[in-house]
């Protein structure tokens, strides 16, 4: 499977770089790099619970979002290398700390290495694996995860290709995200939960409402409503937009999302009867951005 990395086509960019010798569009080589691995309390309640989600933040990214809160690791290269054995050990360490799941944040460009790590620890890892991504995926790559990942947590960022090109350098974002979310829902099946209300399988589609662009958000919610049964997926609507990184290059992004903008999108979700989560408006703060590291700290 690692032969994919010799001519990388894991993400829709299909940069075809030999990542054993060079960095791909994502900014990463074939060596796994992460910037944090800890219990994370700020995911959806059915993911974090009271014990926390065993979250592993991977360095690099196949998107170029101007408003990325994690820009230190997605764009600026922060992180440290791990072998696949060390990654497997990290998963088991998080499980031993009481994590409800192993939460892989921005994992797309490291899928082959993650699968190897999961194979190493498969006899000891007993909690669900969460694939937490920006939604810019290929169904063919997701198929590799069949039997390895139980929960998918994708973003669905944009409907309009003009916006996805402007803010994330990905004019083909929606077409790829749409196909991938269908694939994720097929792989995970309908949402299931344990006796504590912690998700064991299923897909939660996340959407961050951007200032000025509520109509694009509404189109996305309508698309979900027209393409999925209300019990097939869950929706998590986020209001945490805070101008950071290169968002200040765009006047329309130099503010937080208004209550009016957010509520009109909530109304659309409610119209289709989806179960899910609505984020508190107080979440829109830099205090919720975790600290990232350049070297092993545990």
At which residue positions do the language-model features occur?
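Auxiliary Fe-S-binding modules of radical SAM enzymes
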Residues: 1-23, 190-298
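Conserved glycine-rich "GG(E/T)P / GGGxP" loop and the immediately following alpha-helix
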Residues: 95-121, 166, 172, 182, ...
